[in-house]
């Protein structure tokens, strides 16, 4: 365990030294997504045998954002920027011994929500049972880390080198929000979540990072499974 933690820590230190990190944060209204999950989770479990979480939808949003902004789906090799032909999304999984591993969903943009849900569940189970193959932990082009699992609102995640960006997902909380109506402003209870995007400022500027993050936020706020 000591050896594994040293390797992970040195990788994170290297990332901070190599990449000038910038982190943007946006608050997202996911009320529609929460209602969709509540409506469909029981039927999904009966049909697929796995729990329906928010991660498949978030992963789908990221895959679509990477397709729309291919400048983020890159890696850095010395002074060269390498554009990736495939969208391979790594999802950080916390292990029982306190360590972390990032299994990768290859060609995530080619999977529908069912496929993403099954892939995420399968990779997480393999990770916790030490059954991942080398291919399942390599080739990632972007990473998602979900610290909302630990009731954290938001954070500033460290980029998984040699990628150039990482998305952090916070917990979903109910909040009172002012909503505009034809009759005037009213107070409504909405489900809110923070997303934080850390990116390598050598490659991704503020405009690109902001547009990429807002693409994901807008997709989640307007989510429909149809």
What residues fall within each predicted segment?
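C-terminal catalytic/motor cores of large multi-domain enzyme assemblies
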Residues: 1-4, 9-226
């Amino acid at each position: 365990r000591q050896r594994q933690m040293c390797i992970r820590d040195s990788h994170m230190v290297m990332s901070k030294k190599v990449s000038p990190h910038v982190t943007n944060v946006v608050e997202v209204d996911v009320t529609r997504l929460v209602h969709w999950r509540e409506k469909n989770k029981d039927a999904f479990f009966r049909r697929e045998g796995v729990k329906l979480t928010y991660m498949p939808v978030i992963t789908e949003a990221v895959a679509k954002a990477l397709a729309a902004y291919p400048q983020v789906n890159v890696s850095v090799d010395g002074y060269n920027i390498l554009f990736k032909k495939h969208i391979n999304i790594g999802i950080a999984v916390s292990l029982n011994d306190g360590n972390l591993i990032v299994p990768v969903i290859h060609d995530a943009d080619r999977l529908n929500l069912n496929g993403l849900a099954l892939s995420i569940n399968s990779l997480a189970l393999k990770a916790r049972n030490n059954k991942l193959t080398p291919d399942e932990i390599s080739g990632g082009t972007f990473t998602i880390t979900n610290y909302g699992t630990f009731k954290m609102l938001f954070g500033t995640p460290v980029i998984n080198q040699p990628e150039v960006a990482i998305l952090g997902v916070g917990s979903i909380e109910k909040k009172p929000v002012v909503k505009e109506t034809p009759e005037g402003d009213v107070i409504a209870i909405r489900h809110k979540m923070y997303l934080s995007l850390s990116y390598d400022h050598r490659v991704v500027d503020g405009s690109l990072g902001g547009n990429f993050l807002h693409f994901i936020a807008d997709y989640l706020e307007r989510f429909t499974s149809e």
